[in-house]
Amino acid sequence: MINTALVSFGMSGKVFHAPFIAANPNFNLVGSWERSTKNIVATYPGTKSYNSYEELLADSNIDLVVVNSPNDSHFAYVKSALLAGKHVVCEKAFTNTSAEAQELDELANKKGLKLAVYQNRRYDADFLTIQKLISEGEIGDFLDVQISFERYRTTLSPKKHKESVTPGAGLLYDLGPH
């Protein structure tokens, strides 16, 4: 049983992480750090709402931390979790620079910990269909690929971390990894 905690119980925690962790018999959803509301306890009775990230990391019951916070915080949260001896799954975009990614990879290896990047579109039907057609020999070698993934909004997102002009923000970091 892998005791797991989320860094956030916002949209990605509620939709992409908690339901799958709770449904898998190999995982135990222990709780989440929630800066404002305490929704995880209401949604998943028996879980804990941590008051700080430090409190979450200090919990010796936690084996795995899912870092699902704004992109610009990933490096610091992942590094802190690894230094605390926790395995980590981090949402895309993993880090803002390749140097940060390399540092985290080296730290995880040095400490004998697992570090993985979560990419939620990996098993979407379009990608699985292409993979199947290639493996069955239905289509040959690719010379060029164009994939379109769009998001249209008439207004900027109220989530400042997605629309601001800062490292880790904007469409390239938000949608580019898909």
Where are these regions (language model features)?
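Short, conserved SAM-binding/catalytic segment
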Residues: 41-47, 103-108
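N-terminal Rossmann-like dinucleotide-binding module
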Residues: 1-44
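Beta-strand-loop-alpha-helix segment that lines the small-molecule cofactor/substrate pocket
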Residues: 64, 70-71, 75-122
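Predominantly a Rossmann-like dinucleotide-binding segment in NAD(P)-dependent oxidoreductases
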Residues: 122-178
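Short acidic-hydrophobic, aromatic-tinged amphipathic segments that line or gate anion-handling sites
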Residues: 48-52
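Nucleotide donor/acceptor-binding cores
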Residues: 2, 113, 140-143
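Acidic-histidine catalytic/liganding microenvironments
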Residues: 24, 44, 59-60, 124
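Short, Asp-centered acidic motifs that coordinate Mg2+ and/or phosphate
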Residues: 31, 63-64, 144
